């Protein structure tokens, strides 16, 4: 229906493209202002008239042609307000949303997107800060896949660097094989924290750490064996968390994968005369771009993560021939990626324009940024299990006879954490507030999941029923139903905008809006009635709503329990 209005406006406005008309067309917040509204401000220059006069003339022009899809078309100030013929509108919407792939797009067909996300630092616990990149990245993967893109999910593990030199020193001085095998990453974290405490008093420990990392880079057998052991232990924990979240990756190619590929970066920089020596190290100067220099090699000849990121980009372009490469990391890495992308540009690659940094805000509980070095860390697994346990307690209190309580608790608990992370713009900080996150009545994951379960319960109460292809659309013209149907039609556009802006929160907000509109419909419109026409039409509305909610939550990585 929106496309029909765009076509009608396009017929009557030669001075504006269809794309611009589509972008300008609005859904008014108040129903008494119509179903759609078109502002005429942008036409003032072309028409050389006041916007309200343009609106008046165009309204008269449209009414004169007598389009049967409108109940009426009026102008209010500089706006043209369209009131649709409700039965025709209801039919059009139901035909649109009642499709298996509603919301899916084709703009990504034949295109590849690489998304680099999660990427925890090996030998360190997976904390809630890592949850943000994992949750946002997974949602972007699903959103881009929905639009037809082929997506490569890359977990660029932080499995190389001087921190491993520190950890090897710490292990040799204060660790034991038995303790590490028994306690895993917790033990590695314990000795890593001790290293930093001791290094503040004895700087020679840092020198020893650098020496061990150089040994790693030179292929020292002992150093690499210890490093690989640390990595294997870490991956067991990380994969356990990904399984709990219901997520996976196509590649676990961390920084170490590129350690033998950094020479290509150095050679290309030398060929372009971009590599300069500075205090013994090698850098790319970015002064003229108002950026700090990009460090390529340290004094001791060891590589740095910028070098490995550059090597990774060259490898990914060659291997996947991506149309876009997205990095989902904290805001504190903004400069790092600006430098890396600028170096790619200076190397003469025009695909630097297809490199995107998607930053996000911090995570805290009762205030305070998370830190690894002093041991003041909130672990992801701890948070996830706590959410599951708290939901389990709520279910035991409110619905103790619920089947599959354990599985429902997992779905709702994990879903609550994911939804809380994705409900606001990613750049905003996330603060854990259990009462808010687990609220079944607020703008939360459990609320949307409960709405889905409510839809499912309608069909359980009705029993086995085969929904007809056509229904009596005249019974779907009340305000509650129309508002719900109009909201559902936004889904494809919301997905596109979420992809364009790298903002999954748009999907989360849409899901809440649909849930709210459905619950108003559920309250106002009795469904299981004797009149078969009314019953079937309203069941059809429940069915399409249920499918859209499930699809929207899936784009956020959230499952939908049938009962709650």
For the regions a language model picked out, list residue spans one by one.
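Non-catalytic interaction-recognition regions
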Residues: 1-90, 99, 104-564
């Amino acid at each position: 229906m929106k496309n029909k209005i765009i076509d009608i406006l396009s017929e009557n406005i030669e001075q504006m493209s269809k794309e611009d008309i589509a972008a300008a067309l609005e859904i008014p917040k108040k129903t008494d202002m119509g179903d759609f509204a078109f502002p005429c401000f942008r036409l003032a220059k072309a028409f050389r008239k006041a916007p309200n006069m343009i609106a008046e003339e165009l309204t008269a022009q449209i009414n004169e042609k007598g389009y049967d899809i409108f109940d009426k078309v009026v102008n209010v100030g500089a706006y043209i307000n369209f009131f649709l013929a409700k039965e025709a509108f209801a039919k059009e919407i139901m035909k649109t949303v009642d499709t298996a792939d509603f919301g899916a797009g084709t703009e990504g067909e034949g295109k590849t997107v690489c998304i680099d996300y999660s990427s925890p630092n090996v030998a360190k616990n997976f904390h809630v800060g890592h949850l943000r990149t994992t949750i946002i990245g997974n949602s972007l993967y699903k959103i881009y896949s929905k639009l037809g893109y082929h997506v490569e999910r890359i977990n660029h593990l932080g499995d190389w660097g001087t921190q491993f030199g520190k950890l090897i020193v710490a292990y040799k001085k204060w660790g034991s094989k038995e303790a590490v095998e028994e306690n895993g990453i917790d033990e590695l974290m314990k000795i890593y924290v001790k290293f930093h405490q001791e290094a503040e008093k004895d700087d020679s420990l840092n020198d020893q750490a650098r020496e061990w990392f150089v040994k790693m880079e030179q292929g020292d057998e002992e150093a690499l064996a210890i490093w690989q052991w640390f990595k294997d232990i870490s991956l067991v924990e990380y994969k356990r968390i990904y399984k709990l979240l219901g997520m996976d990756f196509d590649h676990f190619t961390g920084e170490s994968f590129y350690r033998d590929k950094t020479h290509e970066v150095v050679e290309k920089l030398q060929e372009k005369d971009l590599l300069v020596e500075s205090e013994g190290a090698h850098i790319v100067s970015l002064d003229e771009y108002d950026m700090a220099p990009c460090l390529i090699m340290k004094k001791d000849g060891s590589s740095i993560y910028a070098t490995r990121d550059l090597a990774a980009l060259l490898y990914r372009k060659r291997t996947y021939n991506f149309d876009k490469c997205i990095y989902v990391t904290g805001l504190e890495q903004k400069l790092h990626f600006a430098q890396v992308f600028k170096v790619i540009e200076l190397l003469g690659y025009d695909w630097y324009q297809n490199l995107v940094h998607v930053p996000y805000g911090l995570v805290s509980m009762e205030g305070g940024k998370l830190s690894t070095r002093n041991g003041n860390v909130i672990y992801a697994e701890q948070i996830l299990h706590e959410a599951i346990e708290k939901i389990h307690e709520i279910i035991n209190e409110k619905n103790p006879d619920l089947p599959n309580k354990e599985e429902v608790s997992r779905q709702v608990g994990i879903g609550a954490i994911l939804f809380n992370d994705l409900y606001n713009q990613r750049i905003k900080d996330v603060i854990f507030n259990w009462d808010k996150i687990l609220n079944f009545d607020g703008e939360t994951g459990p609320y949307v999941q409960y709405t889905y379960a409510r839809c499912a319960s309608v069909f359980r109460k009705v029993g086995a029923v085969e929904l007809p292809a056509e229904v009596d659309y005249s019974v779907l013209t009340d305000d509650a139903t129309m508002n719900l149907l109009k909201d559902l039609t936004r889904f494809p556009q919301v997905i596109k905008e979420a992809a364009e802006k790298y903002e999954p929160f748009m999907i989360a907000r849409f899901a809440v809006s649909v849930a709210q509109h459905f619950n108003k419909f559920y309250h106002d419109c009795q469904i299981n009635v004797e009149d078969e026409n009314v019953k079937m039409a309203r069941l059809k509305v429940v069915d399409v709503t249920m499918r859209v909610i499930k699809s929207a939550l899936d784009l956020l990585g959230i499952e939908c329990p049938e009962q709650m």
